[in-house]
């Protein structure tokens, strides 16, 4: 009997020991599988180090989705695109003293093209399904495709927008009958610039030839590039600009005429400056520059007055398509461990969810990147309190509905071509303007002589 009881006791003890061992093993397993949060670094351009809409969203992510997923985003640098371009290349090339490349950084494709080895970047195709990518504006994705790999992912885009000092334009309109609708085509805008020059000159009858330029364009290169392409002809042949087409001539003639007659601002600097001083009243600039358009004009004699700035889609040629340059950097993902890359991709997905993306872009003056997010803009506009921003986002909606976004070609010589074009065209037209003011030649001769001089200078 005792033997039986002892056997039962031994069995019970054995079971208890086994259960205890298994429980301990299970506890150890849990401890081993629990991971520390993955901390990812990012360099970006949206705001300042201490005052940034993206930093605020990153804090939100870290406290919600990131907390749930065990992901923490840490901001390493907030600067401008040029600085980040330089720092990324130093890090990528492992220059002495360079910082470590962050997990995520904001970049233009030109930065990737300038890398010695772009294989250090992850392909977003590995983390976004084709079904997920269908939600994005195709042209925005296309700009970030390099050699078949999606290396620069769109999170916020800008485009070119026409900004108008409506306050002064209304005075001009009241005196001349000019209409805001005349700003819809390049032909009408250039004609109107001649009228504006004469009108502004007449405001000070005691001072001769002090008319003002109506238009300032931040990107003369883009005007020609998009203009020629909108007329159905290639602007580039390989990496060379094609000048000897009728379409280039069509884009050149009204532009050069207006510039030589004084209707286009040709000085250096950004378009915001002549609008701030009243030297011009219409500008074509990046939509992101809305941050720098002031609601007050300060004239050269120190007089100032409040003004209303409105935004409109850029003009087009009457017989051309509605084409507009897309702008704005994207976000690059540095290769590391699969877990880190996947965590970074989750943050990018979160930031580009329609509601979140609209929240982000409307705080920085950019466009959203998906079709669904664009559909949310009308409601978002109603929540904006700044009339200038309301006007900008309505212009975004009109642009997205009516225009095709143009993606500049990805080639090593693109930036050099752009810089040389901008410098030479301002220089040649400024020279022609002086000759015109000195009555050295008639306008027709100057338009086409200057074309020849300019095209020769680009060889």
Regions found by a protein language model. Give the residues of each.
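Short, solvent-exposed loop/beta-turn-alpha elements that line the ligand-binding surface or hinge
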Residues: 125-136, 178-182, 207-208, 213-215, ...
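Glycine-centered hinge/linker elements that transmit conformational signals in sensory
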Residues: 190-197, 237-269, 309-310, 314
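Extracytoplasmic/periplasmic solute-binding protein
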Residues: 147-155, 160, 187-241, 280
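Short, well-ordered beta-strand elements
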Residues: 36-48, 70-77, 103-104, 215
């Amino acid at each position: 009997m005792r033997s039986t009881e002892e056997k039962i006791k031994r069995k019970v003890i054995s079971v208890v020991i086994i259960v205890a061992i298994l429980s301990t093993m299970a506890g150890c397993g849990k401890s081993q599988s629990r991971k520390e949060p993955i901390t990812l670094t990012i360099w970006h351009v949206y705001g300042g180090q201490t005052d940034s809409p993206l930093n605020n969203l990153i804090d939100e992510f870290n406290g919600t989705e990131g907390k749930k997923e065990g992901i923490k985003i840490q901001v390493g640098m907030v600067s401008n695109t040029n600085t980040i371009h330089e720092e990324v290349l130093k890090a990528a090339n492992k220059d002495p003293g360079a910082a470590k490349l962050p997990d995520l950084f904001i970049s233009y494709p030109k930065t990737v093209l300038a890398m010695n080895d772009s294989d250090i970047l992850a392909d977003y195709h590995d983390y976004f399904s084709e079904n997920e990518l269908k939600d994005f504006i195709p042209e925005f994705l296309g700009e970030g495709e390099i050699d078949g790999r999606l290396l620069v992912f769109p999170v916020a885009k800008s485009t070119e927008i026409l900004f108008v000092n409506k306050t002064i334009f209304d005075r001009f309109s009241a005196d001349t009958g000019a209409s805001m609708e005349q700003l819809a085509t390049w032909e009408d805008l250039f004609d109107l610039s001649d009228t504006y020059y004469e009108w502004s000159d007449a405001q000070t009858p005691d001072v001769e030839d002090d008319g003002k330029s109506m238009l300032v364009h931040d990107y003369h290169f883009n005007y020609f590039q998009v203009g020629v392409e909108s007329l159905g002809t290639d602007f580039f042949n390989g990496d060379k600009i094609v000048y000897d087409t009728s379409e280039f001539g069509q884009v050149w003639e009204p532009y050069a005429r207006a510039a030589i007659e004084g209707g286009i601002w040709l000085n250096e600097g950004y378009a915001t400056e002549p609008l701030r001083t009243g030297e011009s009243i219409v500008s074509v600039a990046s939509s992101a520059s809305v941050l720098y358009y002031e609601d007050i004009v300060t004239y050269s004699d120190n007089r100032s007055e409040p003004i209303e700035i409105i935004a409109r889609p850029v003009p087009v040629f009457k017989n051309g398509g509605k084409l507009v340059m897309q702008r704005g950097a994207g976000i690059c993902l540095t290769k590391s461990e699969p877990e880190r890359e996947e965590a970074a991709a989750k943050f990018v997905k979160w930031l580009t969810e329609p509601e979140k993306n609209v929240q982000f872009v409307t705080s920085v003056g950019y466009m959203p990147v998906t079709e669904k997010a664009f559909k949310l803009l009308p409601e978002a506009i109603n929540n904006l309190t700044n009339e200038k921003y309301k006007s900008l986002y309505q212009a975004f909606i009109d642009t997205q509905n009516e225009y095709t976004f143009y993606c500049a070609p990805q080639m090593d010589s693109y930036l050099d071509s752009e810089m040389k074009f901008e410098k030479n065209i301002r220089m040649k037209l400024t020279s022609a303007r002086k000759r015109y003011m000195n009555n050295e030649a008639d306008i027709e001769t100057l338009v086409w002589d200057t074309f020849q001089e300019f095209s020769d200078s680009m060889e």
